[in-house]
């Protein structure tokens, strides 16, 4: 046997080490302070244990899935969380872009540079109205209109022509539409402002599936290109809008529209200045038209008479109309035979002759809706007895109508099945007569909330609360 006579180099146990004195600690501390920052960083890095690559670089099993399978998985995730998935990696970013179907452009450069099409190649709905407005970034004032929203700086919105002065030129909009149409052939809906006939033709040539079109700042000359859309079914024209821009859509434009869009199903006219001839032409040419909306009516007197030629019209909506017809034809003897629904929202109904002519034209309606209409008192509402086949009545925000005025009309509607009364403060629970109560009991649907007190009492039904102490002070 051989023995090693040298001392073993085994480490000394920590328990046997001598404790450092205070002076040694003080010297070591000042030695660290006198060292350079690079030396200190090197020392601390040497003390940090190395990170194992096996713990950080895990295999990405999603690489085994083809794009179609991964897209189906992403489609199961709610839309609110899909944007976070696009931040995972470049592949998921690309796949997320393929799933986006609707986009609202706020920066025109994003469209003109081609980034919109490369980022979202499968778009079906594109809104370009905000992008057509030259608006400097990082402005703190947001202007909201019922048609468009945009940002302005302090003191910049000083004239009524601000919006029109800051619109992109027609040429720029044309080039943008051409780029959009070239990359989004599956486009189904387009919203644009300040375009031209050529811009519409560029879109119609590439996007044969387009079904819905919304034209802001529209004019008669723009509508010359509307006939190129063979499958157009929904059209919204925004002409003259107070405070934003002035643009004229007259009978000429409505006639061009009628001749070019014979497959229209829904039509909305905002601030248009047509009249009887234009509405008549639409009724005769657009045989498939089922819904007509007139907003901010600026039409000529007598336009109501043109509705009689809309033989298949089922819904008529009047929204935000200060006037309906200045001089309706007294010989309105015909009506829209197929009309099923009349909806009046935020309209002035103070002219009795106009309301009488409107109700006569729509006497075949089965559903009547009044929302926040001014001037709808008992006298005006009594004209609604012209409707003989009403099944649904919806009243909201009609503060001048009373309980007796409501009762005098609906008791004559023997086919009434649905009644909804909301926020009509002069209709009182205490004024409901026995005959009106009997009518309520026979209805299929009753929504009765004429004021907050009525809403409270109906919500407390069956609880015993609000019954003059009956819940706590019962006789024994």
UniProtKB/Swiss-Prot annotation:
InterPro entries to which the protein is assigned, alphabetical: F-box-like_dom_sf (IPR036047), F-box_dom (IPR001810), LRR_dom_sf (IPR032675)
Superkingdom to which the source organism belongs: Eukaryota
PROSITE patterns, sorted: FBOX (PS50181)
Protein name, UniProt field: F-box protein At5g07670
Domain F-box: 59-111
